[in-house]
């Protein structure tokens, strides 16, 4: 599962990984973004170049409003880079994730939320999102630290600081 598709860059990596997988389980990629994304070429490639085809489904809604019951091996999170969003995403998606949670931009937005870096209006975002302003101003690092403290079944597997940062959490209870 990928949430925060935008320009579909990471979606291609997810699709290639599934196409190369030797697993005998059905191959399934779920894509999500709050805005509609152009994935037509990716859908065509998933049908034509993979045998059996990778099943790709998508929903263009706020990921916190998704109604998902089936688990995923991995979730890639690249959405709104603020404490409040990631805290809620981890609470929602960790129970649905069998192996890995991967998060992007965890270095560039580690201490301060992307709202500050991008010069957005935090007061307006607090009103539109319903998140407290301090959860918008704070970065991703605190959400990850709190999650790991509260969930001993998850560990920090990798933390890359180049290219804006990539953090990998691994489930260790099964």
Over which residues does each language-model region extend?
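S-adenosylmethionine/decaboxylated-SAM
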Residues: 1-174
């Amino acid at each position: 599962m990928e949430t925060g598709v935008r320009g579909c860059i990471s979606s291609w990596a997810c699709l290639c990984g599934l196409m190369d997988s030797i697993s005998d389980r059905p191959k399934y990629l779920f894509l999500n973004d709050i805005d509609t994304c152009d994935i037509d070429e990716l859908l065509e490639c998933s049908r034509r170049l993979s045998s059996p085809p990778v099943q790709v489904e998508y929903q263009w809604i706020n990921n916190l409003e998704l109604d998902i019951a089936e688990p995923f091996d991995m979730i890639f999170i690249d959405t709104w880079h603020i404490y409040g969003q990631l805290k809620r995403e981890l609470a929602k998606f960790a129970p649905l994730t069998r192996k890995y949670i991967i998060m992007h931009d965890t270095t560039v937005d580690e201490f301060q939320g992307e709202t500050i870096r991008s010069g957005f209006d935090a007061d307006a975002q607090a009103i539109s999102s319903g998140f407290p302003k301090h959860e918008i101003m704070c970065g991703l690092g605190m959400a990850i630290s709190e999650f790991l403290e509260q969930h001993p079944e998850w560990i920090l597997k990798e933390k890359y600081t180049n290219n804006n940062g990539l953090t990998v959490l691994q489930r260790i209870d099964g």
